[in-house]
Amino acid sequence: MVYVEAVPVRCDPLGYVTEVGLLLQATPEGRMVRSFVSGRVMYRETIRGALLRHLEKDLGALALPQLPPTLVPFTVAEFFPSPSQSGLTDERQHAVALAYLIPVTGECNPRQDALELSWLTPDEALSPEIYAEFSGGRGDLLRQALASAGWGR
């Protein structure tokens, strides 16, 4: 199964990441976890179409995501049902996700199963407190996303 993961960001006029948008969601067990925009690519759907659909579904129609002309992911994430060398888990399935850093310029209002969208600085988003709120290894995906944008050099 192929998925897309999108880390929404706000950038300054030079293109540097100033804020990261993290969704807060409740698990079926009642735990609160941080997450990104994510979802599967439907049959006969393009990657670009899947990204736009999930960004609108999770952030609202006025988020105004800025997809790059070339959709090269910052990583290809492989999720396994049990712990593995990838560090990423999804107890439901073995899945592959193309992960993107996507600038958004509009008004974001979380929809679907998200309780809130928090805009944090990269330092805040990488703090141990926030990192602990991710499940399935997604905190490591955030580190990779920000590293791909030159953060932490």
Regions found by a protein language model. Give the residues of each.
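N-terminal strand-loop-strand
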Residues: 1-36
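A structural signal for the main folded, soluble domain(s) of proteins
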Residues: 7, 11-12, 17, 56, ...
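Structural signal for conserved beta-strand scaffold positions within catalytic alpha/beta enzyme cores
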Residues: 22, 75, 119-121
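Nudix hydrolase/Nudix homology domain
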Residues: 28-34, 93, 97-153
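Short histidine-centered catalytic/ligand-binding loop motif
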Residues: 35-45
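Active-site segment of metal-dependent pyrophosphate-handling enzymes
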Residues: 60-108
